[in-house]
Amino acid sequence: SPRNTYESAMAKQSLGFSTPLMNASTYVRQHFMLYPQIPVVTTKAINLLGLEDRPTGQNCIVAVLPFEGYNIEDAVVFNKSSVDRGLGRTFFYRVYEAEAKQYPGGMKDKFEIPSSDANIRGYRGEKSYRLLEDDGAIMHESIVNGGDILIGRTSPPRFMEEYKEFEVKGPYRRDTSIGVRPSENGVVDSV
């Protein structure tokens, strides 16, 4: 029924303690609640599944009443001190990965810091690559912002005709580095 589909979609969005090994998790993207709590009230289904001892959310004291005489529809007012102490605080964990492919003709990708004087097409400027180490990987625990490069990689041209089209005198490479999405920022957890 549509109601079952709706409920399963809502359950997938719920936060809590999904795995005790979150740093070793293989999920590409995942949300984590920072201060999950064991539920105060449980159901028979939770007891049968053995979930009564697992932190699955946060216990909040809720009052349903008009706020200062105004009937605000679809609004929630939180206590500022509760939010300051971590109520509802979560973090988002995203995995970035890249692989070095081998192409016909013996050409292959290289993990490196792209250089402006190495005839690299699509070079993004030294500021973007400032956090990379010599092997092309970012330094552990670096603070990154949108546009920063996480994995430095160069690739051969896609088609050999590109040599003739752009009248390149020597072999050039393309910058295919992996970067942080423009709207995101964060800290590198592990490499």
Task: Please state what every model-predicted region is.
Residues 1-191:
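Conduit-forming functional cores of very large proteins
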